[in-house]
Each structure stands twice: as C-alpha cells, then as structure tokens.
Amino acid sequence: MLFIQDELYKEYVKMMMNIVILCMILSISLSFWMISITASTYSGTLRPISPWRWLVSLLTPIIIVSHGIKKRSLDSSGALGGLLVGFILTIANYSFFSALLAFFFISSKLTKWRGEVKKCYDSEYKEGGQRNWVQVFCNGGLPAELALLYMIENGPGEIPIDFSKEYTASWMCLSLLGALSCSAGDTWASEIGPVLSKSAPRLITTWEKVPVGTNGGVTPIGLISSLLGGISVGVAYFVTQLVFVDDLEIAAPQWPIVIYGGMAGLLGSLIDSYLGAIMQYSGYDESTGKIVNHPTKDAKFICGKPILDNNAVNLFSSILIALLLPTAAWSFWPRL
C-alpha cells in the first residue's frame, strides 16, 4: 500500500511540474506578445487592437465561464484557467474562439449525458464534468500557446487559411484547429462510444475484448463519434471564417477546414487510445465492478503502465496532431 501511495505521489509531482512549466511558457509567450504588439503598433506595421475587440475578448469568456460554473462543467480552478485560455483565443482570432466554444459546450453536454450509465463503469466520474485547471490547460494550453504565436506572427484578427500567401499563420491556424479537434474527438469517443456500443470494446494494441471504460479500448461507434467531434469543431471554425473574413473571394477555398477537423478528431482519438493502452494503467476493481486508473489491492490488471494520467495522454495526443495536421494539409490544400 505504501508503494502505491509513493508511486501516486511521484506521478502527481511529475504532473504538477508539467503544468507549472506550461504556465511559465504561456506567461513568457504572453509577455513577448505584449512587447511585440506594442512595438509593431508604434512602428506602424500593425493596427492597434480595437476597443470593441478588447471588450468582446474580456466579456465573452466571463459569460461562458460563469455559465460553466453554474452548470457544474467547471470548478473554481477550471474557471480561472478557462478565463485565461478563452481571452487569449478570442483576442487572437474569432475563429479560434468559436472552435473552442464548440468543443467546450458540446463536450460538456456529452459528459452529462447518460451520467447514470457512466457511473457504473467509471470510478472517476464527476457529476456535470467539473473540469479543473489541469484539464483546462491540458486541453486548452496548447491552443493558447499557438494563439499567442499566431498573434506575434500576424497580429490579432481573422485571416483565410492560404499556404501560398500566409504560410506561417496558416500553419498555426491549422495546428490550433488540429489540437482542439483532437480533444473533441477523444471526448466524443469516450462519452458516446461506451454508452451506445452494443459490443465490448477491443484493446487497440492487441484487439482483445476488454471491459467498458478501459484505456485504449475502441469501438466502431466510438471512432465514428470521434470523427463527428472533429467535424463539429471544423464546422464552427469554417462558419466563423465565412462571417468575419473579408477577402475570401481571392483566397484559397476554406471548406477543407471541416474535412481536416474530422481527420484530426479521428486520428487524435486513435493516438490517444494507443497511448492510453500502453502508458495508462487500467485495472478492473472486483470490489466495485469499475475500471480504475491506479493499481489497488482489489484491481485485476488489464493493460498499461502507470506512467501518464488521462490529462497527460490528452496533451501528448494534441501535440502530435498539432504537428501532423498542418504538415499534411500543406501538401493537399487547394491553391488558386
């Protein structure tokens, strides 16, 4: 028992160190952006941020986070993290914000959906979801960092994704889209697949049948759900492009955003499942009949090693998709 507690403590310290490093990176990047935007504004290369954009970027995250607290989708620490991430994405690009909004609202609804069923197999199920700051930063930290880099490169504002004219900014836009679509795809798969699937999931590494809720378990319905989750984020991004980007008629087509969003959701879910199968512990607690993510005296081993937790797996999956998606899109994106 002491060994298990010691391992859990080491895992917690490691996770906290990763979160502290992420917060430092965000703070440093935000400082560089403020210096960059100030210098560029005074040198005449960028227009000042309009008061209207400042107002929207401040008020909108507050309204959404307040709603999240009321609906128990966020706890107090998650609300603070959500305010920071929401502000950065909103002031950077309204398309970024709409993609984040689609992910947050739909995922929150799905987390609450059929909660009585999920309690039966998930030992860590929380009523309403109640995402904390760790979950917020593991899902939104990378998009926030990409949004800051986008502002340093391009300044705040919406642009068409066009690799022939704006290569770096377009790369960052698709990278951010990939990260959010990956998170949405994984959430949709984990919230819908176990509930609607009639057959037992299969472990992605061995294709053996495993209990519902096992890390690394996949089902056809779960994979379809992950595709739809990515598409939902892509649609939100695409619609916002149509509304706020002025020069779409002379830019490359934007409809591939929806397709690449779906691809990121599906591929991200597969990567997440693979990492979960080998780097997350899954055991069946015979005393409760639920899947546990840490070794216990009553847990029967199923798969994986207790190296990462679910938040870390989500973060690594998002990073991989954020790197892969724009690289693939650059080769196949339509050009005028």
From Swiss-Prot:
<feature type="transmembrane region" description="Helical">
    <location>
        <begin position="49"/>
        <end position="69"/>
    </location>
</feature>
<dbReference type="GO" id="GO:0016020">
    <property type="term" value="C:membrane"/>
</dbReference>
<dbReference type="InterPro" id="IPR002794">
    <property type="entry name" value="DUF92_TMEM19"/>
</dbReference>
<feature type="transmembrane region" description="Helical">
    <location>
        <begin position="313"/>
        <end position="333"/>
    </location>
</feature>
<feature type="transmembrane region" description="Helical">
    <location>
        <begin position="19"/>
        <end position="39"/>
    </location>
</feature>
<protein>
    <recommendedName>
        <fullName>Transmembrane protein 19</fullName>
    </recommendedName>
</protein>
<dbReference type="Pfam" id="PF01940">
    <property type="entry name" value="DUF92"/>
</dbReference>
<keyword id="KW-0812">Transmembrane</keyword>
<comment type="similarity">
    <text>Belongs to the TMEM19 family.</text>
</comment>
<keyword id="KW-0472">Membrane</keyword>
<feature type="transmembrane region" description="Helical">
    <location>
        <begin position="86"/>
        <end position="106"/>
    </location>
</feature>
<feature type="transmembrane region" description="Helical">
    <location>
        <begin position="250"/>
        <end position="270"/>
    </location>
</feature>
<feature type="transmembrane region" description="Helical">
    <location>
        <begin position="218"/>
        <end position="238"/>
    </location>
</feature>
<keyword id="KW-1133">Transmembrane helix</keyword>
